[in-house]
Amino acid sequence: MNAVALLRAEAGSSPSGTGSFNPFSNFFVVVQNLAFTKLVGIWGHDAGTGTWSFHPCSYSRSVPGNLEIWETGLGLPPDQFDVEYQVLGNIFWDNNAGYNYSLDIGAAEGTDGVGTVVINPNVLAVEWEVDGAGNLNVDVLVKNIAFVKQVAIVYTTNNWLTFQNAFGNYSQSFAPSSSPHQLGAELWKIGASVGIGKTGQFAVFYTVAGTTYWDNNFGLNYSF
C-alpha cells in the first residue's frame, strides 16, 4: 500500500440535549509505520471561508503489515479534505489522486446521525455486535461500483473448524453521490444467528462486476 491512505470519513449531526443538533465528523487513516516520530493529519476546506486548516490525528492502534490506524474527530465537517503524513523528513499525501475527497455538508447538517460518508477501500466493516438473542449484526460500507452486488460475511464459532456465510441487505446510500473521481458509499446490514453467549470471528466479502473484495481486518479477522 501507499505510505498513507484514507480508510473512511463520515459526518452528520447528533442531538445536543437542548433541542438542537451538534455537527460531527470523523476521519480514519492507515499509515506505514516508517518511524516512531510522525505527524498524521487532515487538511480540511471550510466552505464558508474558503480556507484550508490542518487537524492532527491521534494514534489508535497497530495492525499487521507494520501499519498503524490514526483517527480524529472534528465538529463542523469540511466540504473537501486531504490526508497528510510527515515522517523522516518526507511528506506523503492521500488527496484522492489530486481531486480531493468530498463530504456533503448539507446532508451532514440535515441528518440525525451519519449523513455523508467517503470510503477508500471497496468494502469496510464499521460496526458489529451480538445482541441478546444471539444474533450477530454487522454493518458494512461498500463503494457503489455497480448496481448488482452481493455483500456477505463468512463466520465461525469454533476457530474455523467449520464456517458459514450470511448475506446482507441494502440499507441506504450516503451522500455525496458517485462522481467520476469518487464513488458513492452504501450501507449494507448483515445478520446471522450464532447463538446466545457464542464468540467467534468473521470477515466480510463484496462481490461486484465479477470481482470479490475482502475486508478481513488486515488479516486478523473481526472478533465477536
Where are these regions (language model features)?
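Glycan-association/targeting regions that enable binding to alpha-glucans and other polysaccharides
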Residues: 1-224
